[in-house]
């Protein structure tokens, strides 16, 4: 993987910092602040239940199977911190790059085994300091709703991917069946954390974005269909209960509701090979 080292940067403590104090991006004549202070360790957040963590692991497995498999060079945009991608890398992976605007995620990033070259880059997904056609697979884990210019990020992904390379985007779904029920019944929900989201995507929005930029074979897998009261979810720690929860959530209810109505989703696609 070749970095664009002509761009201004510092290299310190194993991190390439290309932000050099950049704090905002201008989109449509509006200056918008970049998220640089994200720092969330879910393990110490009481609202995160065993079932939520189990759902995240399931989504990670889907990314591994549908996006990262057979990729020699992998880029994670918004990874690091509590992300567990290092556990799901393909045996053929030789390079793993984490690009994030936040130093906390980079400093606390879990590094894979040392035979895999790991790059930590502080930069925006909108302007990646990576030369063209360097990467086999990109994951954007729960991050596209945090960026400022989602289309620019997807265009940058297209640029740095090799032909035949894959992209996978995971997100909470603004069009999930239970969010609709909650909003129709006007039930007050206390948010599970105070992260700021610039966008609230549906899987259709992400599919359209990928197609517009030129990606093909765009597919979505919906996940996390089952939501129980927190008091019950907190008690579901036994592996057999979690397995039953996953079966109902991601097999039975997915069959019932279809791929676009889960609480979370993975949308993945391919950059076509040049003809
Ligand atoms: C919900 S977090 C993703 C998961 C996170 N790694 C964790 O462990 O929880 C969203 C991430 O997006 C990063 N981010 C925000 N704006 C970004 C941008 N424009 N380009 C790249 N990363 C960005 C934040 O720093 C944050 O780490």
Where are these regions (language model features)?
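Short catalytic micro-motifs in class I SAM-dependent methyltransferases
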Residues: 142-146
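Class I SAM-dependent methyltransferase SAM/SAH-binding core
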Residues: 75-127
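A short glycine-rich, Lys/Arg-flanked "PGG" loop and its adjoining helix->strand segment in the class I
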Residues: 151-166
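Acceptor-substrate binding/catalytic loop of class I
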Residues: 187-205
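A C-terminal cap/extension of S-adenosyl-L-methionine-dependent methyltransferases
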Residues: 182-186, 219-275
């Amino acid at each position: 993987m070749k970095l664009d080292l002509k761009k201004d940067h510092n290299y310190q403590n194993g991190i390439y910092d290309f932000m050099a104090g950049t704090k905002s991006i201008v989109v449509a004549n509006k200056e918008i602040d970049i998220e640089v202070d994200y720092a969330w360790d879910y393990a110490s957040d009481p609202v995160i239940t065993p079932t939520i963590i189990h759902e995240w692991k399931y989504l990670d497995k889907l990314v591994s199977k549908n996006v990262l498999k057979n990729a020699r060079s992998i880029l994670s945009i918004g990874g690091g911190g509590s992300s567990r991608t290092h556990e799901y890398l393909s045996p053929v992976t030789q390079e793993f790059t984490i690009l994030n605007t936040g130093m906390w995620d980079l400093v606390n990033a879990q590094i894979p085994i040392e035979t895999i070259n790991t790059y930590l880059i502080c930069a925006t997904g909108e302007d990646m300091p990576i030369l063209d056609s360097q990467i086999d697979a990109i994951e954007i884990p729960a991050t596209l709703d945090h960026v400022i210019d989602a289309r620019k990020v997807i265009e940058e992904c297209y640029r740095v991917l090799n032909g035949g390379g894959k992209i996978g985007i995971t997100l909470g779904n603004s069009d999930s069946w239970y969010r609709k029920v909650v909003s129709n019944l006007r039930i007050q929900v206390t948010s599970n954390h105070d992260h700021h989201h610039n966008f609230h995507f549906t899987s259709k929005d992400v599919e359209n974005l990928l197609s517009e930029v030129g990606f093909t074979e765009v597919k979505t897998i919906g996940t996390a269909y089952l939501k129980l009261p927190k008091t019950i979810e907190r008690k579901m720690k036994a592996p057999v209960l979690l397995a039953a929860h996953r079966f109902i959530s991601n097999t039975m209810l997915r069959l019932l509701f279809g791929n676009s109505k889960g609480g979370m989703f993975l949308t993945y696609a391919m950059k076509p090979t040049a003809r």
